[in-house]
Amino acid sequence: RRQLPDDAPTAPPAAGLPWTARLAALWSPAHARATLMLWLLWFTVVFSYYGMFLWLPSVMVGKGFALIKSFEYVLLMTLAQLPGYFTAAWLIERAGRKFVLVVYLTGTAASAWAFGNADTQGALLLYGALLSFFNLGAWGALYAYSPENYPAPIRASGVGTAAGIGRLGGILGPLAIPFLGAQGWSTGAIFGLFAATLMVGVLAVALLGRETRGEQAVG
């Protein structure tokens, strides 16, 4: 049929490109900045999430709480994840993707440091809940933001490789706590490392990321 002026342009299918071409496209001058930013972002978010949350019960036991009580406290902390996710989802269309990611990642980093250095039940519950709130909010913004950085022919490859880098972080994060603990690191120092890692993600978004709110997806 005749193509009308308002017809969306047809993009070449991603499946028609070999994977080597799609990978090369991710590091082309047009997309290298976004790729570096997303790889850093996914690594820091997944590294910190699995590193911290899989070990929360053990951390609580190490701070002097009984094992059963530790699981109860962790359950209470994780309930804060839902409002964190929903508030981030609400804010990304109003304040922008970069703003939400920077704020929620910074909140996660600050909460991680505070949790690692807390020594009372009230402080642990408060900072643990804030940690859950901000971390899952950052996850929500990350899922919305990542595909908006690439055109359709390489979008799946771009997000998939970034998520793959995140998976690497998800493997290394849980291994970090027992390894560093065996080297004599305190809980505060270990969670300080997670906080510093998260701030790398903050800098990546702030310095390398672009705001995609309101942009029309490139077909």
Predicted regions and their residues:
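Intracellular cytosolic loops and amphipathic helices of Major Facilitator Superfamily
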Residues: 1-34, 62, 215-219
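Extracytoplasmic gate region of multi-pass secondary transporters
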Residues: 27-86
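Interfacial helix-cap and linker-helix signal at transmembrane-aqueous boundaries
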Residues: 60-61, 91-92, 177-185
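Helix-to-loop junctions at the C-terminal end of transmembrane segments
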Residues: 86-96
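Cytoplasmic membrane-interface "Motif A"-like loop-to-helix N-cap segments
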Residues: 94-105
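C-terminal ends and interior cores of transmembrane alpha-helices
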Residues: 106-119
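A membrane-interface helix-boundary motif in multi-pass transporters
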Residues: 181-196
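Multi-pass alpha-helical transporter architecture, strongest
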Residues: 195-219
